[in-house]
From Swiss-Prot:
Increases the formation of ribosomal termination complexes and stimulates activities of RF-1 and RF-2. It binds guanine nucleotides and has strong preference for UGA stop codons. It may interact directly with the ribosome. The stimulation of RF-1 and RF-2 is significantly reduced by GTP and GDP, but not by GMP. It comes from the Bacteria. This is Peptide chain release factor 3. Belongs to the TRAFAC class translation factor GTPase superfamily. Classic translation factor GTPase family. PrfC subfamily. It is found in: Cytoplasm. Pfam families: EF-G_D2, GTP_EFTU, RF3_C. Its main location: cytoplasm. One of its GO terms (molecular function) is translation release factor activity, codon nonspecific. Keywords: Cytoplasm, GTP-binding, Nucleotide-binding, Protein biosynthesis. One of its GO terms (cellular component) is cytosol. GTP binds at residues 23-30, 91-95, 145-148. It comes from Rippkaea orientalis (strain PCC 8801 / RF-1) (Cyanothece sp. (strain PCC 8801)).
C-alpha cells in the first residue's frame, strides 16, 4: 500500500466518531437525536415526535407505524458532519420490546450515550442496556434530560449512577436551577455560564450567551439565590474531587455527565462539542485472525442490520455494514466470509434514516448501506484480501410465541416473502413446528409490540392480512447438543420441540420450573438461552 493511501486512511479514521443512544422509553431519545442533527446542520428544523400534525415528523422515526405511534421501533443510521468530524449516530429503538435490535446496533458502536430523564433517574431499560454496553466495554457518556421540568436533585442523580451502576461520574456541566427556574448550565471545561433563550419551541438552534462566573453581567440574568446555589454546588463538586480521566472513560470506568433539555436545546451543543473531544475514535476489533486495526490497508466490515422496504416504491432490501478496516470504494469486489462467494458492491449508499445518497468511499467507523439481494445475514463479514471473520452477534431467548396464519391462500407468495424478509432483518425470530402437518411459522418475540409490528408490516408492505394463534410458552432454549442429543434424550415432558430458521432444535417451556426440571433430568442436552447468528452460526 502506498504511503499516500496509508495517510489518507489514518486521517479519515481520526475524524470518525460514532455512537448509539440508550435510554428508557420516553426519556427523550428521538428529541435529542434530532437536536444533535440540528446542530450538526443535517436538518434545519427539528420535528418533535409528539408534535402537532402541521409540524414535521421525526427524521429518525421513518417507518409508517413509528410515525403513527410516536415511538422508535427500528434502528436507523444518521450521518452528518460537524466541525470537520464525520459522525455516525446509530439511533436505536426506544421501546423495550426491541432490545435485541438495540443490542445488534451496539455491536457496531464505538461509544454510547446514556440518556436519563431528570425526574425519574435510572429506569429498567436503561439499566439493561447499560449492562450490554459494559459487556462490550463501550465508553459511556451521560446526558440528563428534561431539566426544564420538575426534577430530582442533580447531586442525587449522580449518586444513583455511581451506586447502582458502579460507574464513577464527572459533571462536565452543571444545571442552574431546574423546572420553570432552569436558566442554563455552567460549563466546567471553560468556566462559563451558558444562558439560553427558547426559540420556536426548540425547533431551531438556541441563541446562547456565555458569561464568565465572576462577570457583573450575571446579576442581570440570574436571581441572587440561584447564583449562590450554583457557587455552593460547584464547591461541593470540587470537594468530591477527581478529574475526567480519558483512559478511565475509554475503559468504561467513568462517565462524563451533561445536563440539559433536548426539547428546548439547552446544553445540546455543549454536549456535542465535548463528546467529539472526549469520544473514542474507531479502534481495532476482534476477529478470527486477532485484533485488526482500522488503519489496516485491506477493507473489511460486518453486517449488523438488515432492513426491508426502506423505499416502499422499490421494495428494496438494505444491509447496514459497519466498516472496520481499510478503505471501501464503490464497485469493489469483496469476499463473503460465510459462503466463500465474491460479491460486487455496486450501489453503496450513505444512510440518513430512509433517505440515501450514493457514496464513492468510506473508512473505518462509517456505516454504509448495501443493496441486499438475499446474500447477507446479520453478523456476516465481508473483506478484501486476507480472509477474516468478526465475532458473531448473538440471538436472544424470546418470551412469547404465536403461530402466524395466512387466511387467504391466494396471498401465499406474498406471505412467504414477507416472513422471509422480516426474519432476515431481525424484526422477529421465526421458528417452525417439527410436525410436518403444521406449516405455519411460529413468531418468537420479546414483547407483544413485535407481533403488532409484524402484522402491520405484513399488511402495509406485503398486502397480507394475518391472524395470530398464541402458544402457551414463555421460555425458549437452544439445544447445543443438536438433534442427536435430543433423540438420545427420549421424550421430554412439558415442552414443545421446534426448529429455528437454521433447523437447529429449540425447546419451548411454559415456565422456568419446567425448564429447570429438564435441565436437572437431561443435562446432556446443553440448553442455552442464546444462539449465535450470521457468521457465528454453528451450522
Amino acid at each position: 500500500m502506498s504511503s499516500e493511501l496509508q495517510t489518507e486512511i489514518q486521517e479519515a479514521v481520526e475524524k470518525r466518531r460514532n455512537f448509539a443512544i440508550i435510554s428508557h422509553p420516553d426519556a427523550g431519545k428521538t428529541t435529542l437525536t434530532e437536536k444533535l442533527l440540528l446542530y450538526g446542520g443535517a436538518i434545519h428544523q427539528a420535528g418533535a415526535v409528539k408534535a402537532r400534525r402541521d409540524q414535521r415528523k421525526a427524521t429518525s422515526d421513518w417507518m409508517e407505524m413509528e410515525k403513527q405511534r410516536g415511538i422508535s421501533i427500528t434502528s436507523t443510521v444518521l450521518q452528518f458532519e460537524y466541525r470537520n468530524f464525520q459522525i455516525n449516530l446509530l439511533d436505536t429503538p426506544g421501546h423495550q420490546d426491541f432490545s435485541e435490535d438495540t443490542y445488534r446496533t451496539l455491536a457496531a458502536a464505538d461509544n454510547a450515550v446514556m440518556l436519563i430523564d431528570a425526574a425519574k433517574g435510572l429506569e429498567p431499560q436503561t439499566r439493561k442496556l447499560f449492562e450490554v454496553c459494559r459487556l462490550r466495554g463501550l465508553p459511556i457518556f451521560t446526558f440528563i434530560n428534561k431539566l426544564d421540568r420538575p426534577t430530582r436533585e442533580p447531586l442525587e442523580l449522580l449518586d444513583e449512577i455511581e451506586q447502582e451502576l458502579g460507574l464513577k461520574t464527572y459533571a462536565v456541566n452543571w444545571p442552574i436551577g431546574t423546572g420553570d427556574r432552569f436558566k442554563g448550565v455552567f460549563d466546567r471545561r471553560h468556566q462559563g455560564i451558558h444562558l439560553f433563550e427558547r426559540r420556536a419551541h426548540g425547533s431551531q438552534q438556541a441563541q446562547e450567551t456565555a458569561i464568565k462566573l465572576g462577570d457583573p453581567k450575571i446579576e442581570a440574568h440570574l436571581e441572587q439565590e440561584l447564583y449562590y446555589q450554583l457557587k455552593e454546588e460547584l464547591e461541593i463538586l470540587q470537594e468530591l474531587g477527581g478529574d475526567l480521566d480519558l483512559k478511565e472513560l475509554h475503559d468504561g470506568q467513568i462517565t462524563p455527565v451533561f445536563f440539559g433539555s433536548a426539547m428546548t436545546n439547552f446544553g445540546v451543543q455543549l454536549f456535542l462539542e465535548a463528546f467529539l473531544e472526549y469520544a473514542l475514535q474507531p479502534e481495532g476489533r476482534n476477529s478470527s485472525v486477532g485484533v485488526v486495526d482500522p488503519t489496516h490497508p485491506e477493507f473489511s466490515g460486518f453486517v449488523f442490520k438488515l432492513q426491508a422496504n426502506m423505499d416502499p416504491k422499490h421494495r428494496d432490501r438494505v444491509a447496514f455494514v459497519r466498516v472496520c478496516t481499510g478503505k471501501f470504494e464503490k464497485d469493489m469486489t469483496v469476499s463473503h466470509a460465510r459462503t466463500g462467494k465474491t460479491v460486487r458492491l455496486s450501489r453503496p449508499q450513505k444512510l440518513f434514516a430512509q433517505d440515501r445518497e450514493s457514496i464513492e468511499e468510506a473508512y473505518g467507523g462509517d456505516v454504509i448501506g448495501l443493496n441486499n439481494p438475499g446474500v447477507f445475514a446479520i453478523g456476516d463479514t465481508i473483506y478484501s484480501g486476507t480472509k477474516l471473520e468478526y465475532e458473531g452477534i448473538p440471538c436472544f431467548s424470546p418470551e412469547i410465541f404465536a403461530y402466524l396464519k395466512n387466511p387467504n391462500p391466494s396471498k401465499f407468495k406474498q406471505f412467504q416473502k414477507g416472513i422471509q424478509e422480516l426474519r432476515e432483518e431481525g424484526a422477529i425470530q421465526i421458528m417452525y413446528s417439527t410436525d410436518d402437518f403444521k406449516r405455519d411459522p411460529i413468531l418468537a418475540a420479546v414483547g407483544q409490540l413485535q407481533f403488532e409490528v409484524v402484522q402491520f408490516r405484513m399488511l402495509s408492505e406485503y398486502g397480507v392480512e394475518t391472524n395470530l394463534e398464541p402458544l402457551p410458552y414463555s421460555v425458549a432454549r437452544w439445544v447445543t447438543g443438536g438433534w442427536t442429543a435430543l433423540e438420545k434424550a427420549g421424550r421430554i415432558f412439558n415442552s414443545m420441540t421446534v426448529k429455528d430458521n437454521w433447523d437447529r432444535p429449540v425447546l419451548l417451556f411454559k415456565n422456568e420450573w419446567n425448564l429447570n426440571q429438564v435441565k436437572a433430568d437431561k443435562p446432556e442436552l446443553g440448553l442455552s438461552s442464546t444462539a449465535p447468528v450470521g457468521s457465528g452460526i454453528n451450522e
